[in-house]
């Protein structure tokens, strides 16, 4: 059992805020917002300032960093325009759909640098990324430089004493990509200097931003070759941290005790660890995505981050403004259809009094908190039986794992329900025709004449087909190695078998949700909108996009103070629970207390009536601005400015005089009753007293708009 304890991060930096009151919440802003810099690169062009962003996931959908880079592309392009270029490996299967190939215009140092590398035999693809913003792209074909791998490794050994195993293909590819990018940037700088001199421009100022250790090789090469380029390195999760947590170690209690070299060596990743640590220490500016990851990096990589760069979202993509409540109702009805089919023969609960909870992500049973989620559901089941027997919770676990096929019982249920619906529709049409004909003749319809024996026989056949002796399955697929599967083993241990007496029903869906799925028929985004609560009690989560996506879609969620998202919300919202963000303490209390707290949160949510849930969803959706890249992108700009000033001391960014944190702070809604914590001096943005009727007017209006009395 993991003891759950971590450490708070002290920040004595005094930050001044301009208080701006709003009738829904208090908003405290630091001096600048990224929107202030949206000029499509006009200022950057005049300053001859260039920004290169390097990641393995650029136009290459292979992980969470792809979401970060892709969603940030729009605001990055709005800020930097043609002075921005993104770089990564060329993967043909992804590039076909992600990239529009085209050459850079003549007289552009980018084109000159590309042609210079092509003359050396390197294959380079240029164009634009087919995402919002359409940033410029340079993708490097790793295979075209594989013949120089031994030379690259030799230089890495001579200058850094890092040896790369011959059989580690992933690291070999990272070495090739890193050297290709470093050579390109070196050539680009030379051409940019010449171009500036010929056109009487100021000297070029170049920033290269590298994400994760695979891209960090390029940073190491630039610094060891003494190329005058400002560098930023961002780690989204430390390499060693992932391995340690995957092994169920008591991670946060032992961060300062790990012998990092020994631990990396035992896991045969010492060379990768050295590359990550080398990039961390050689970068002019080092950033992490959250303070808790920063603390992890401080102990495992031995450098404290200079700036925290939280992950944002392109909120415009999820934005539904006044429609999100209606979208919830539409999506919920589609989930209702699944529930009718999956639980056929056992639908003894009212779907209007049924709540849908879900957990989703990579199948990391302990790291994602699935262990305590299932345990807390067992306790919730007991509490609901005692306190609210008319309320049912259906808990979905969406974790992709190896399966053999769909569960036959689940498929049969959907076929039976479809047959019943078709039969009822046919009978309904026949009854309607008979009623019309009877009325047309001037007679009052008789119930016995309307519903005939043939109709009753058809209905009875369908009802007999719906009878089942077994309980509804807990999984929609036949899971390979199901006797060892951690989710199924935990469900068995907690006796959550979907019996008639259980008020918590379990559905394990071991596959990503898509609109072509024959069971659900909806994609993940629509599924989230249809649920009532997302539960993500993670033990190791450097950021956590799943609860963030719930928030911008107006769906309340449970997170923890060991996730980057949870820490961020704790820091920026004085009473997160009022806004539908429930934060489980996995730092300072033991596992048993964390499970109890999670079950209490879920029970508290289950007690809410429909009106209260609608009001809470409205409050949750109001946090969207806090998670938008237009808000959080300012931290990336701050990191670039700091790197530029390290390499070019004369560089001054007049507009960058803003605080380093707390871009937005939300206080308690005025309609929420005060609590003792709101008076503590440590609580951010204490609530300002307002009229008690202030939110009630909004609630009535919201309900009226939705047609709910």
UniProtKB/Swiss-Prot annotation:
The modification Phosphoserine is found at residues 26, 30, 660, 667, 671, 675, 679, 687, 691, 696. Pathway: Glycan biosynthesis; glycogen biosynthesis. Its EC number is 2.4.1.11. GO terms for molecular function: alpha-1,4-glucan glucosyltransferase (UDP-glucose donor) activity. Residues 666-709 are annotated as: Disordered. Keywords: Cytoplasmic vesicle, Glycogen biosynthesis, Glycosyltransferase, Phosphoprotein, Transferase. Residues 692-702 have a biased composition (Acidic residues). InterPro entries: Glycogen_synth. In third instar larvae, isoform B is highly expressed in skeletal muscle but not detected in fat body. It comes from the Eukaryota. It catalyses: [(1->4)-alpha-D-glucosyl](n) + UDP-alpha-D-glucose = [(1->4)-alpha-D-glucosyl](n+1) + UDP + H(+). The modification Phosphothreonine is found at residues 682-683. UDP-alpha-D-glucose binds at residue 61. GO terms for biological process: cellular response to starvation; cellular response to sucrose stimulus; glycogen biosynthetic process; response to sucrose. Belongs to the glycosyltransferase 3 family. Transfers the glycosyl residue from UDPG to the non-reducing end of alpha-1,4-glucan. In larval skeletal muscle, isoform B is required for the formation of autophagosomes during starvation and during cloroquine-induced vacuolar myopathy. This is Glycogen [starch] synthase. It comes from Drosophila melanogaster. The gene is Glys.
């Amino acid at each position: 059992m993991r003891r759950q304890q971590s450490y708070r991060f002290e920040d004595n930096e005094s930050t001044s805020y301009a208080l701006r009151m709003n009738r829904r919440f208090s908003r405290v802003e630091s001096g600048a917002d990224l929107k202030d810099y949206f000029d499509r690169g006009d200022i950057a062009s005049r300053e001859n300032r260039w920004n290169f962003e390097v990641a393995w996931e650029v136009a290459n959908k292979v992980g969470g960093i792809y979401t970060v880079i892709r969603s940030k592309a729009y605001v990055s392009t709005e800020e930097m325009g043609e002075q921005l270029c993104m770089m990564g490996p060329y993967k043909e299967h992804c590039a076909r759909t992600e990239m529009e190939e085209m050459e850079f215009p003549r007289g552009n140092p980018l084109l000159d640098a590309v042609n210079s590398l092509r003359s050396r035999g390197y294959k380079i693809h240029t164009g634009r990324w087919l995402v919002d913003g359409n940033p410029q792209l340079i993708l490097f074909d790793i295979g075209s430089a594989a013949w120089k791998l031994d030379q690259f490794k030799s230089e890495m050994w001579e200058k850094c004493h890092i040896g790369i195993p011959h059989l580690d293909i992933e690291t070999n590819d990272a070495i090739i990509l890193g050297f290709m990018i470093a050579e390109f940037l070196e050539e680009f700088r030379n051409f940019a200097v010449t171009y500036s001199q010929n056109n009487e421009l100021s000297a070029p100022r170049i920033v290269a931003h590298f994400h994760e250790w695979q891209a960090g090789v390029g940073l190491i090469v630039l610094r060891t070759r003494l190329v005058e380029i400002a560098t930023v390195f961002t780690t989204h999760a430390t390499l060693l941290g992932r391995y340690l947590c995957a092994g169920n170690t008591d991670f946060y209690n032992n961060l300062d005790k790990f012998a990092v070299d020994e631990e990396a060596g035992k896991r045969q990743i010492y060379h990768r660890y050295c590359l990550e640590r080398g990039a961390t220490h050689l970068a002019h500016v080092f950033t992490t995505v959250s303070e808790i990851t920063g603390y992890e990096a401080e102990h495992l990589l031995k450098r404290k981050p200079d700036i925290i760069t939280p992950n944002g979202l392109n909120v415009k993509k999820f934005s539904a403004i006044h429609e999100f409540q209606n979208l919830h109702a539409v999506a919920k009805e589609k989930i209702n259809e699944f529930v009718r089919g999956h639980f056929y023969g056992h639908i003894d609960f009212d779907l209007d009094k049924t709540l849908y909870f879900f957990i989703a992500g990579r199948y990391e049973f302990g790291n994602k908190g699935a262990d305590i989620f299932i345990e807390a559901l067992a306790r919730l089941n007991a509490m609901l039986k005692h306190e609210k027997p008319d309320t049912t919770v259906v808990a979905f676990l969406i974790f992709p794992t190896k399966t053999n096929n769909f569960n036959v019982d689940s498929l049969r249920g959907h076929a039976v329900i479809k047959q019943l619906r078709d039969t009822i529709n046919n009978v309904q049409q026949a009854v309607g025709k008979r009623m019309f004909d009877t009325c047309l003749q001037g007679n009052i319809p008789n119930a016995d004449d309307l519903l005939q024996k043939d109709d009753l026989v058809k209905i009875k056949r369908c009802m007999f087909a719906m009878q089942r002796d077994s309980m509804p399955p807990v999984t929609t697929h036949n899971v390979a190695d199901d006797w060892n599967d951690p989710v199924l083993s935990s469900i068995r241990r907690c006796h959550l078998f979907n019996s008639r007496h259980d008020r918590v029903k379990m559905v394990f869906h071991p596959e990503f949700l898509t609109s072509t799925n024959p069971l659900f028929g909806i994609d993940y985004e629509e599924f989230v909108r249809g649920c009532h609560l997302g539960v993500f009690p993670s033990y190791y989560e450097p950021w956590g996009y799943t609860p963030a996506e719930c928030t911008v879609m107006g769906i309340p969620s449970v997170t923890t103070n060991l996730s980057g998202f949870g820490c961020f919300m704790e820091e920026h919202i004085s009473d997160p629970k009022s806004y539908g963000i429930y934060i489980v303490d996995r730092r300072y209390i033991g596992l048993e207390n964390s499970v109890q707290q999670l079950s209490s949160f879920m029970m508290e949510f289950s007690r809410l009536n429909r009106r209260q849930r609608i009001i809470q969803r409205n409050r949750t959706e109001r946090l969207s601005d806090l998670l938008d890249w237009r808000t959080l992108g300012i931290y990336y700009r701050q990191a670039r400015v700091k790197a530029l000033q390290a390499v070019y001391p004369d560089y001054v960014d007049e507009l960058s005089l803003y605080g380093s944190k707390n871009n937005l702070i939300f206080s308690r809604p005025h309609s929420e009753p005060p609590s003792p914590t709101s008076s503590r001096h440590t609580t951010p943005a204490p609530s300002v007293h307002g009229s008690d009727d202030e939110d009630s007017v909004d609630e009535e209006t919201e309900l009226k708009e939705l047609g709910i009395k």
